[in-house]
């Protein structure tokens, strides 16, 4: 038998923005304002996606309730819109607030049936089924609060990224020791994902490695500011500098001890997995 626990599906209010920048200075100022208000957006009850590509900056955010249960949600976002509208070289091409009956309707309209979507087209804008090098950086709340300008510069240096405002709130209240993986989630606000693909039919191994190195170099630009190696293990980076701390933080020594005790011969081993530092990159030969 199976027991299901069900929950009500409350309505949600979604906010969509498309901003376009015509100058590098305007683009940088937009990022500075976004970084500055980032913690306030989360504290006011909004979460979601803020992809950007080339000259365009998008928001696809969602708050619980219709109207939002947090009375600051709408006003906080409007304050950001009003601020960036005054920046020379920045134009707001789309600004929409729309209620949905629940998360499922919002998801179906914007991720499944793209003809109903608003703003960034996730069906087209996010590629799948192609080889790609991926990186993830979990950006702590402290970076948004104390390294505002440096973080904005690092973000603006990326032409294309898919960040997710999914931290804070209840996420930050969970004991980081409650699970083995990703303790950095408890102090982060946004997870920025960077990806770059290659031609599967023509790329040489050297060219593939160059793509992987480029993605790591881009991610390092963010990590240099955050001083935090935290990364999302489901968006694993092939050349990540310190996978032990990135994925498991201070849990790693204990996890490695467990692994060595349970599997002393490394029968089960994967690249960048626990206790894999004693193997070569192809997990073919032991190096320690």
Task: Please describe what each predicted stretch is.
Residues 1-288:
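Soluble FAD-dependent oxygen oxidases
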């Amino acid at each position: 038998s199976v027991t299901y626990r069900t929950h009500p599906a409350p309505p949600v209010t979604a906010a969509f923005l498309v901003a376009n920048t015509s100058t590098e200075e305007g683009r940088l100022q937009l990022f500075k304002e976004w970084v500055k208000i980032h913690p306030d957006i989360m504290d006011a009850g909004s979460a979601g996606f803020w992809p950007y590509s080339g000259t365009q900056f998008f928001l696809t955010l969602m708050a619980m309730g219709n109207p939002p249960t947090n009375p600051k949600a709408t006003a906080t976002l409007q304050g950001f819109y009003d601020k960036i509208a005054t920046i020379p070289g920045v134009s707001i091409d789309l600004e929409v607030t729309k209620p949905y009956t629940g998360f499922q309707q919002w998801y179906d309209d914007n991720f499944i049936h793209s003809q109903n979507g608003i703003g960034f087209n996730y069906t087209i804008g996010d590629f799948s089924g192609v080889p790609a090098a991926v990186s993830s950086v979990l950006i702590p709340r402290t970076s948004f609060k104390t390294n505002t300008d440096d973080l904005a510069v690092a973000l603006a240096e990326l032409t294309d990224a898919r960040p997710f405002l999914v931290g804070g709130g209840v996420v930050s209240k969970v004991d980081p020791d409650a699970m083995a993986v990703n303790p950095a989630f408890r102090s982060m606000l946004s997870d920025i994902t960077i990806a770059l693909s290659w031609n599967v039919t023509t790329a040489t191994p050297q060219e593939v490695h160059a793509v992987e190195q480029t993605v790591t170099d881009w991610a390092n630009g963010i990590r240099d500011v955050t001083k935090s190696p935290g990364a999302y293990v489901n968006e694993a980076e092939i050349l990540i500098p310190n996978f032990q701390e990135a994925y498991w933080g201070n849990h790693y020594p204990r996890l490695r001890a467990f692994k060595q005790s349970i599997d002393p011969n490394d029968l089960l081993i994967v690249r960048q997995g626990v206790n894999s530092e004693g193997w070569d990159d192809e997990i073919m030969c032991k190096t320690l």
